[in-house]
Design a protein with these regions (language model features):
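General small-molecule cofactor/ligand-binding pocket signal
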Residues: 36, 87-91, 142
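Short, hinge-like loop/turn segments at secondary-structure boundaries
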Residues: 50-54, 105-107, 129-130
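A short acidic, glycine-rich active-site loop
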Residues: 54-69
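Structural beta-alpha unit
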Residues: 77-111
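Glycine-rich, Arg-bearing micro-motifs that act as flexible, cationic patches
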Residues: 110-135
Length: 145
């Protein structure tokens, strides 16, 4: 079950806790880890309340990509002591959908995910990501508080 663990990280404290738990499991079972950050791009459909021009949307998406890469760099630093095989991915799309898709694409045997994302207005939304992943994933899901 822990031969290849997918760990979504978003920079929140719970995602780092999930990564640490996944690391322990991977070490104990001599497994691999796939660490993923999913950015959800801006588009006009998502911004119906305040329509923005394409240049502003593109600039926002570039910033999201920078943030996603920064989260993955932090993950790489935190994973330096892990001796097993590890992979780091930046994905674009709806978080729960991409997490489930990556788990299939990479033939992961389990998912270890934090229970909530960053605090603030996104907290409810990101908490629903772990809920959707646990409901629709085809592999076992461990939710870390």
């Amino acid at each position: 079950m822990f031969e290849k663990i997918l760990v979504p990280v978003d920079g929140s404290e719970t995602s780092w806790k999930a990564m640490e738990e996944a690391k322990k499991l991977a070490e104990a079972f001599r497994g691999e880890m796939v660490v993923v950050n999913v950015i959800q791009p801006y588009n006009n459909a998502a911004l119906l309340v305040v329509p923005l021009d394409q240049a502003t949307i593109s600039q926002g998406n570039e910033e999201l990509t920078k943030i996603g890469n920064s989260v993955l760099e932090t993950a790489k630093e935190k994973m330096q002591d892990f001796k097993g095989k590890k992979e780091f991915l930046l994905e674009v799309g709806h978080p729960s959908e991409r997490i489930i898709a990556v788990s299939k694409e990479k033939a992961c045997t389990s998912i270890v995910i934090g229970s909530r994302g960053p605090a603030g207005t996104a907290e409810f939304f990101l908490g629903s990501v772990s809920s959707k992943v646990s409901q629709y994933a085809s592999v076992p899901v461990l939710i870390v508080k």
